[in-house]
Amino acid sequence: MSKKPAALIILDGFGLRNETVGNAVALAKKPNFDRYWNQYPHQTLTASGEAVGLPEGQMGNSEVGHLNIGAGRIVYQSLTRVNVAIREGEFERNQTFLDAISNAKENNKALHLFGLLSDGGVHSHINHLFALLKLAKKEGLTKVYIHGFLDGRDVGPQTAKTYINQLNDQIKEIGVGEIASISGRYYSMDRDKRWDRVEKAYRAMAYGEGPSYRSALDVVDDSYANGIYDEFVIPSVITKENGEPVAKIQDGDSVIFYNFRPDRAIQISNTFTNKDFRDFDRGENYPKNLYFVCLTHFSETVDGYVAFKPINLDNTVGEVLSQHGLKQLRIAETEKYPHVTFFMSGGREAEFPGEERILINSPKVATYDLKPEMSAYEVKDALVKEIEADKHDAIILNFANPDMVGHSGMVEPTIKAIEAVDECLGEVVDAILAKGGHAIITADHGNADILITESGEPHTAHTTNPVPVIVTKEGITLREGGILGDLAPTLLDLLGVEKPKEMTGTSLIQK
């Protein structure tokens, strides 16, 4: 019996905008895409910012896009998750934070807050520190100390004073907190097992050892005078009038490490929490029994509490298809294979029962502008064969070209990439339609739609432009205002499968 497959076709990096200059999507001849756009119901989807769980205005990417598509819901990335928690009041009700504060209050101990002191948004955000200071004040703490790690990488190399001034203003306004130590991230956030660096940061925080200054701004001024900028500032101790350190991390104190990205938070956390730590000698009087809180899950090796626990993505599209006994195919070339498999399945490597995967090797060229068609024709040939063999109920396909060639910032090769994809798209969709099936044609984020900056330079990054969605089924209407998280419910809708409660996205097909 002939299967009537429903396919989700992702044209990676295929964004939409009206302006044609530097817009390979608009400049390319794409008769098949245009035919489907004109013949079938279509809309645009938001694929950036909070609609995909990123901060407002931030461009999407392939990992985030495929996570949202497969999950059928907005998957909040750590930064946005914490921002939303602050905005909606969940942050100050977070039990892990409250327990750390109770430990300090009930045992007359200090609360130490440490993390990267910037608004770079890659490892941390200074607003999260301010929210912790407000919470500490609200809960009546007085002994609150900040150990600031200077950035200079995710923000400008000499911006530390801006952030220290912001922090000093907040301390004054909120009425709690003192800066106890300052160190460049080169020391406190090493991830390459350069323990001599980590030890310097540790000794400043735990023992009050290192160069000493009366204020954080003095540390920076002195460093700059010696040609040492933010990232590389030597771990330094802030002292009181009598020359004693403002604070040292001591036995039984509470610590909240407000970085959200794990990789550069693990080593310094292990130094404070791991009973079997052997990478350098912490000394006899190292602080023990700390109530140590990580903002997110850093590592199994870190012996601490986690404020924002990992979100397990249950009932992604692949799992739901499998539960209903439907056969599914995931197909892409090497560059986007992890996206249609691992990310589409919510971070799961293993196949679901009834899932088949086809990997087509990407061409071995230095850069893809040298071969803009990449392996699109091979992907198409393999898929058409599968469709004709009536094996699959659902197909998830990615064409990598608009994104991978778009990253070159070169208009002509990207036009060629899109024209190759359009040719393949026509054969694939027509094969599906010939079987009585349906296709959803869409994208995960923009890229090929802006290849030239306003100043005429090559534009190699993703864009925040909307992406298309076409459903090749006549007699239906698609609603406006859709997001990537609505695609899985739409695919299930085409297959007559009810979406699970975990999928908070809704089908784009109007009822």
From Swiss-Prot:
Annotated positions binding Mn(2+) 2: D12, S62, D444, H445
Q: PTM Phosphotyrosine: list the residues.
A: Y36
One GO BP = glucose catabolic process
The record's free-text note on cofactor binding: Binds 2 manganese ions per subunit.
Question: What is the documented function of this protein?
Answer: Essential for rapid growth and for sporulation. Catalyzes the interconversion of 2-phosphoglycerate and 3-phosphoglycerate.
Family indicated by similarity = Belongs to the BPG-independent phosphoglycerate mutase family.
Protein's name in the database: 2,3-bisphosphoglycerate-independent phosphoglycerate mutase
Q: Which organism is it from?
A: Bacillus subtilis (strain 168)
Name of the encoding gene = gpmI
